[in-house]
């Protein structure tokens, strides 16, 4: 898999479903494109919604499994992640349904921007993404110099 790369603008349909862009559907694993395929949705702390294929989520789940329920910080992290997680079916047309809870979390009414971020897709309300980019332009420059 080459990974999800790029940015697409789309609109949810009247039932709150997102059509996965063709360029991203091509990158889905065969297990994620057949009948009964699923995708994991997570309400990200930054106000976006992240979409993970099952095989990617399984790797993340293993990382969470080693955290101790007896360590308050680790237990809190697990609770917060699992509270923000859902698994939904991708329909035959490649649509992903979003619950009202997820749409409200992200401030999404109809239009969205989908960013391919290698192993995941990140869904933003356009206004929130524009504000994030504008408010963090200098910080981005500093981070890019530090890590690249």
From Swiss-Prot:
Protein name as catalogued: Transcriptional regulator MraZ
SUPFAM superfamilies on file: AbrB/MazE/MraZ-like
Domain SpoVT-AbrB: residue ranges: 7-56, 85-128
Family to which this protein belongs: Belongs to the MraZ family.
Subunit structure: Forms oligomers.
Transmembrane segments: none
UniProt keyword annotation of Transcription regulation present: yes
InterPro entries in the cross-refs: MraZ, MraZ_C, MraZ_dom, MraZ_N, MraZ_sf, SpoVT-AbrB_dom, SpoVT-AbrB_sf
Keyword Acyltransferase in record: no
GO MF term set: DNA-binding transcription factor activity; transcription cis-regulatory region binding
Intracellular or extracellular location(s): Cytoplasm, Nucleoid
Highest taxon, organism lineage: Bacteria
Entry's Gene Ontology BP terms: negative regulation of DNA-templated transcription initiation
Pfam families named among the record's database cross-references: MraZ
Keywords assigned: Cytoplasm, DNA-binding, Repeat, Transcription, Transcription regulation
One cellular-component annotation, GO: nucleoid
PANTHER family from the UniProt entry: TRANSCRIPTIONAL REGULATOR MRAZ
């Amino acid at each position: 898999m080459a990974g999800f790369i790029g940015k697409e603008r789309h609109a949810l349909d009247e039932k709150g479903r997102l059509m996965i862009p063709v360029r991203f559907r091509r990158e889905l694993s065969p297990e994620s494109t057949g009948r009964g395929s699923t995708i994991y949705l997570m309400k990200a702390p930054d106000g976006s919604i992240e979409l993970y294929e099952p095989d990617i989520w399984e790797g993340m789940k293993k990382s969470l499994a080693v955290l101790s329920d007896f360590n308050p910080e680790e237990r809190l992290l697990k609770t917060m992640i699992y509270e923000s997680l859902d698994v939904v079916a991708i329909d035959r047309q490649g649509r992903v349904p979003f619950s009202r809870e997820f749409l409200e979390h992200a401030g999404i009414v109809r239009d969205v921007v989908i960013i391919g971020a290698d192993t995941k897709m990140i869904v933003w309300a356009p206004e929130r993404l524009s504000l994030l980019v504008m408010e963090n332009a200098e910080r981005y420059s500093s981070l890019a110099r530090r890590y690249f």
